[in-house]
């Protein structure tokens, strides 16, 4: 898609979301800095959250290794903390590639070999748990799940005084309408027990029009049900959209959190060109900690580089308080700033093994990391290459971009690289001249 048309589309989408979330922005307030984590924050509950593992039944699959590392890395982290518990793992669907038995065997094997005493693994079914059977009988997906995981496809569990409610797709593998009454009943029980504490809900698709990816990878029945419960902190996957992106958390009438993927994080720059994989290997999961008063801390962990993201951490006090919305779409957009390159930033040029030109330049950062770069390569007045590329903000360990612009003829070129934030705020462009000999 033409880079200029993309800019128009991005502006339209940003305006549409601003209008849609306008009411929530006014209710929750804007220009409010999220609170820092108190020094005396002491968890009484710790759990990890992932989705979209997509196991294929092979132990050397990268996704299988990452799911294994989720357990081991979280145990290692917990051992360094004052509260050493690792109480639960949530898998918000798509643990398998197609719901096939060998994939479940691998899933169960990883849990059996790595999940220690005191840690519960809570699971719900995603659409991929039905894929193998849809052409003749999707209900077989339930039978296979029950054989390997649990007789209960929907669960309500209490851990350390906190409620966890998991909801699977109906046996068609597509809808939730038949699950609404059950979900309401379980939410009412949880609210009656702990009205001022967070209630953790998880299902595979995003609630419609909440987090990043919920325009086109979502379910409306889930959204309308949860809207009545401000205590809810909902975890969802399905889109694979980058959980490191600030749009992957949103507080409206409840709190929504996108879980990304243990397979590959994805992005969508304009909702027209389609979903794109983020550059390189990417995968992430959340580690959540809750104190005795119900204050919640979310920390994002890079499952590829095995480290936390430095700046992707959300402290949410008073989750059930309707007036406290530090992480609304409107507030986060209001505190966002245009990303800027470092003052001494330069573009270097290299050639890969195929003879194609690669541009190397440092990451740009504002309040949030740059989400994309709009790059133009010109020979004189003629544009010979232009595109919008997703940044490497899906990795906690990378500080530099490498962008392949293809084979260029010998000559002199001008490169312009403009950074943009997740909320489409543009920073000062980096320009450079280069010679292809």
Residue ranges and their predicted role:
Residues 24-102:
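N-terminal active-site segment of His-dependent metallophosphoesterases
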Residues 100-188, 193-194, 218-228, 244-279, ...:
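Extended active-site neighborhood of metal-dependent phosphoesterases/phosphodiesterases
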Residues 190-212:
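Short acidic, glycine-rich surface-loop motifs adjacent to enzyme active sites
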Residues 247-343:
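Binuclear metal-dependent phosphoesterase catalytic core
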Residues 355-368:
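Conserved aromatic anchor
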Residues 422-437:
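Extracellular fibronectin type III
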